[in-house]
Amino acid sequence: ENDYAEFFMSYRIREQLSPDLTFATDIIMNSDLEDVSYLYKYGEYISKNEIDTAIYLSTFTEEEIESMARTYTEGYRLGFEAAKIDLSAKKTVNIRYFLGQERMVKAAIEQFRAMGLEPICYRYAVSRINRRLISRVGYSSTVPNKQLEYDHRMDEALFLDKKLMERKLEVLRQAYRNLAHEASVYAGPAVIEVFGENPFEPVSCDANPVLDKKQQEIQVEYRTESAQIVNEYIEQDKCSFTIIAYPIPEIGDRYREIFRA
């Protein structure tokens, strides 16, 4: 009998806190970003959005890319300055981005490193034991089938109970205990969002798994207690964040115009 919580959750926390897991960083820093075939190294779904984004960014001059990245990284640094938080005490930054944006992300990594921050780039959670609804926190690409993702947003209803919740909290606590130093030097997320996706109206189906009342209570209890564990190791008043957003090609024919607006 094994719920695999220890493996999947422990590894997920390591992904979020350790700069030693460099799968995505290596793709960004070591690939020829002029050749869009680098996108397929991720093993993710690659659509016209990702390809056209990468192609468009390849037309920018180095100065333009540096300027884009500087707006992003300086926004991050100034957030610490405004909050009077000592950024020099931090060693890592989590970069969240949309595939196709690697040319800008590469410049941002170099700028963050000049601030003394190593990048942490991880994929959005795919295991239901780590994922919340349809949230995609981390690097991601276009969702190939939004209805399918919506249909399975509460698959944990098939197995969630009090025992599993307690097990997850136990594993979470131990994972943070093992990575206490990494948590203490984590500066916070630097997020690159996208906008302009085609509207999607999900269709509900009675066959879809949904949490019952008891499971909803368990979920609320888990979120409350897990947040307390995270806050014990990552002091929120010593972290900051930044968010910037760019359009994606499916926004329409004026994509390039909107991008530069």
Model-based region annotation:
Residues E1-A261:
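Active-site bordering "gate/hinge" segments
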